[in-house]
């Protein structure tokens, strides 16, 4: 096997610093809201930094408790995506065997392992989608016969223009397929 006949790109998935950050911030905020709502119901402060004497339970305390519970649940959801490494995996291009393998981890259950394999002959082109603005989108797609387009880049933290151009050009050259810009 030639060392240059296989290319493998790892995908980070949900174990990004931003997800850890948001899980902690949203969880802390949710606990603060929940304790404030409960303090207004019980008519004494559960935490010394919360002063809920002037908050009446209905409707403010009830709404704060509701938002607190939602924040805690969302924080737990983010924590579970981090724990289970949802979205983590790799893209492997093997010219020797003539296959492309795309692997990702999902949530526990029957679809925990997402493992897709395609023949290199089924690939029509590599397509790059660039969209700038407040929410930039920079994605490399694998265009398969039958009008399927499979995203190859990670979600959430877009690559720089230079990185995405280099990776797409390198991949198109490696697979000897057309590179489409959109």
From Swiss-Prot:
It comes from the Eukaryota. The keyword Manganese does not apply. It is found in: Plastid, Chloroplast thylakoid membrane. One of its GO terms (cellular component) is photosystem I. It is a multi-pass membrane protein. The keyword Transport does not apply. The chain crosses the membrane at residues 22-42, 66-86. Its main location: plastid. GO terms for biological process: photosynthesis. Keywords: Chloroplast, Membrane, Photosynthesis, Plastid, Thylakoid, Transmembrane, Transmembrane helix. Seems to be required for the assembly of the photosystem I complex. Belongs to the Ycf4 family. This is Photosystem I assembly protein Ycf4. It comes from Tupiella akineta.
């Amino acid at each position: 096997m030639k060392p240059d006949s296989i290319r493998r790109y790892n995908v980070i998935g949900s174990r990004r610093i931003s997800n850890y950050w948001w899980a902690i911030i949203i969880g802390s905020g949710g606990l603060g809201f929940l304790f404030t709502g409960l303090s207004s119901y019980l008519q004494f402060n559960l935490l010394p930094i919360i002063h809920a004497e002037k908050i009446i339970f209905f409707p403010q305390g009830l709404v704060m408790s509701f938002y607190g519970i939602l924040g805690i649940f969302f924080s737990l959801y983010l924590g579970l995506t981090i724990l289970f490494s949802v979205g983590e995996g790799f893209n492997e291009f093997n010219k020797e065997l003539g296959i492309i393998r795309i692997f990702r981890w999902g949530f526990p259950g029957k679809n925990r392992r997402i493992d897709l394999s395609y023949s290199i002959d089924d690939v029509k082109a590599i397509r790059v989608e660039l969209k700038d603005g407040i929410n930039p989108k920079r994605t490399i797609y694998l265009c398969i016969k039958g009008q399927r387009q499979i995203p190859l880049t990670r979600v959430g933290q877009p690559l720089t223009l230079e990185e995405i151009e280099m990776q797409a050009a390198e991949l198109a050259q490696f697979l000897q397929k057309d590179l489409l810009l959109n």
